Amino acid sequence: MTKSDKSTPTANDQTKTPLPMWKKPWVKNSLTVLLFVAAFLLIRPIMQGDVIQGQAPAMQVQTITGKQINLQALNQQGKPVLVHIWATWCPICSASKGGIESISKDYDVINIATQSLDDDQLLDYAKEHEMNPDLIVNDLSGHWMTTFGAKAVPADFVIAPSGKIEFVEVGFTTSWGLRLRLWWSQL
């Protein structure tokens, strides 16, 4: 056998070794998405904590502008109510406030600011952030957060016209997700 008989790879040879299945981009991306979904589903019960289920508690509250809100009276109007618990110091709550304000144009919303500011400061905060102060209830002591069993903010409770808590979401939820839940709860 001569030296020229040997086949040696040259720069022109374009033979590639196939990637193992787990290194293919679509497999990596699918596994990443699956991992995030699994993590979300595992963390979700911890975030939900011991939130109440069943009938919503009786609520007779006053907003920072002095307006009286009665949850049971709102339920009797035949539309669902969104109870939104948030805090001024919560960055996720800040991200969702525009959606909550838009929902309040179509549905009744009880907007509970928990463990945040006094009434005057909260009124200034509402004006500065273009929020409707007639919907904001000051829960400085955290009473309503405890009553609803929320361990984190934002916490959203969709209450059906029957007064039953239909859906609970803790953490960021899109306005469309909340609208869908509100619509579904009145069927």
Where are these regions (language model features)?
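N-terminal targeting signals for export/organelle localization
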Residues: 1-62, 187
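Generic structural signal for well-ordered beta-strand positions
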Residues: 69-70, 166
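Short active-site neighborhood of thiol/selenol oxidoreductases, capturing the structured segment around
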Residues: 70-94, 100
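Hydrophobic beta-strand anchors of alpha/beta hydrolase catalytic cores
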Residues: 82-83, 109, 156
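Structural microenvironment flanking redox-active thiols in thiol-disulfide oxidoreductases
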Residues: 94-129, 140-146
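Short, internal strand/loop/helix patches
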Residues: 126-162
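Thiol-/selenol-based redox modules, centered on thioredoxin-like
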Residues: 158-187
